[in-house]
A protein has these predicted regions:
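Donor nucleotide-sugar binding/catalytic pocket of nucleotide-sugar-dependent glycosyltransferases
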Residues: 43, 59-62, 138-194, 204, ...
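Conserved donor-binding/catalytic core segment of Leloir-type glycosyltransferases
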Residues: 203-229, 242
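Short hydrophobic beta-strand element within catalytic cores of glycosyltransferases
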Residues: 310-313
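Aromatic "clamp/platform" in nucleotide-sugar-dependent glycosyltransferases that forms part
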Residues: 293
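Conserved acidic donor-binding segment of nucleotide-sugar-dependent glycosyltransferases
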Residues: 325-326, 330-336, 344-350
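Short alpha-helical donor nucleotide-sugar binding micro-motif in glycosyltransferases
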Residues: 272-273, 280-285
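N-terminal subdomain of nucleotide-sugar transferases
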Residues: 1-49, 53-57, 398-415
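Nucleotide-activated donor-binding/catalytic signature segment of Leloir-type glycosyltransferases, i.e.
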Residues: 253-276
Length: 415
């Protein structure tokens, strides 16, 4: 008989930071806890003190913040890796795969419980940014990819947010089973705003607003977007680019550029803003955009879609599975194409409204409250059916086929 209330371990180096991975982990943990299951979060520097479900439990593992602008925390809980006192756990859900992931693997083996891994951000793309000297050396070859494969291969199955992300992992020889399901967005993003009034606060009255909600990091290419917007502004004189989001390695460069005379009248940076303001900006913006060639999913696009705002983004990993080209927005292969698509939508109010309605309808499938219910089914399946096969050393092909058959009956999950 299946256990009615599960004790689920969430393992991540990111939880309280302001970025897509941290949001995905935090919102899912809260949504599962709201269903009555115990979620135990093992993460460094967790910010406590806010109202949360009684079944959401925080376990501090220690860490040092080495990049205050991004909130990146280096955590190496060596003293905990081989000593697990949490024998109540039923399953481990691992969200980051370096040292904390290794700890979770060791604990799971010691406890004899299954483990699932969500693969959001490839370490290969971020190590050089957050660990500047050693990281640059490590990313010159495929050492980091091989390390991730070594860890991920130990999981009962791997979860990714989009099909294009699965294709990327398969290109780097990650093994099946790999299942695709959105990380989901918080139900609060669907709030029906009766009053907005946000344009006055951010000096956007009478403007056609392109919103770029993102951390200011090189992989998000904010500088490229600012420069191409200068050309776009010539075609639409009342167009305005508003950047919002947490600080990152590109923050100072962005601030310097937008102070220049040729940009300051039609580009602004608001920094990290309160959630109510972000929600109102998603609602009032004419368009949102995201220009990144490697995304787990592109949650900021989904958040805007929940408020009925269409998007233009890079035709790349993650984003290409979120924007439905010609229906909820456009996918661009280069910046010139990006510029043309933005101009087209800003000039055509009817088309933009149609795309916005489509976007809001599509976004309904991404509510994290519904995604959490699917996760409970996956956890129970893994505990009761999949893990026993791995424990008894059944061949991988048998396990892959079992996963493929099971997810046929689940909403929003594909193989």
């Amino acid at each position: 008989m299946a256990k009615q209330v599960l004790d689920i371990g969430f393992f991540s180096t990111m939880y309280s930071q302001i970025n897509g991975t941290a949001h995905a982990v935090r919102f899912l943990s809260e949504a599962i806890a709201n269903l009555g299951h115990n979620v135990h979060v093992f993460a460094p520097r967790v910010q406590n003190g806010y109202k949360r479900p009684k079944t959401l439990h925080f376990h501090e593992i220690g860490g040092v913040m080495i990049a205050p602008k991004t909130g990146f925390v280096l955590s190496a809980p060596i003293h905990k890796i081989f000593f697990c006192q949490h024998d109540y756990l039923d399953i481990s859900h691992i969200h980051t795969h370096a040292v904390v992931g290794s700890m979770a693997v060791n604990w799971s083996k010691y406890l004899g419980i299954p483990m699932i891994g969500t693969h959001n951000s490839p370490m290969q793309y971020y190590t050089a940014q957050y660990v500047p000297i050693i990281g640059k050396l490590m990313t010159k070859g495929d050492l980091i990819w091989r390390y991730e494969r070594h860890i991920v291969d130990k999981y009962d199955f791997v979860h990714v947010a989009t099909k294009s992300k699965k294709d990327l992992l398969r290109d780097y020889r990650f093994k099946e089973p790999i299942v695709c399901m959105t990380n989901g967005i918080h139900d609060l993003y669907f709030t029906n705003l009766k009053e907005n009034g946000i344009r006055e606060k951010y000096n956007l009255e009478g403007k056609k607003v392109l919103l770029y909600a993102s951390r200011l990091s090189p992989e998000k290419h904010p500088i490229d977007i600012i420069k191409i917007f200068k050309e776009l502004h010539k075609a639409i004189p009342n167009a305005h680019l508003l950047l919002v989001g947490s600080d990152g390695p590109s923050t100072e460069q962005v601030k310097r550029i937008i102070k220049k005379k040729q940009y300051r009248d039609f580009v602004s940076y608001a920094g990290r803003i309160p959630f109510p303001d972000l929600l109102k900006l998603y609602d009032t913006a004419d368009l949102t955009c995201l220009w990144s060639w490697i995304e787990a999913e592109g949650l900021v696009l989904l958040e805007a879609m929940a408020q009925g705002t269409p998007s233009v983004g890079a035709n790349a990993c993650g984003i290409s599975n979120i924007i439905r080209h010609g229906e909820t927005g456009y996918l661009a292969n280069n910046l010139d194409q990006f510029k043309d698509y933005v101009i087209k939508l800003l000039k055509d109010d009817d088309l933009r409204a149609e795309f916005g309605k489509n976007a809001q309808k599509v976004a309904q499938d991404y509510r994290v409250s519904e995604i959490a219910k699917t996760w409970i089914k996956l956890y129970n399946f893994t505990i009761n059916e999949l893990y026993p096969l791995r424990y008894n050393r059944k061949d991988r092909k048998t396990r892959v086929e079992l996963v493929k058959e099971f997810i046929l009956h689940l909403p929003n999950v594909t193989f």
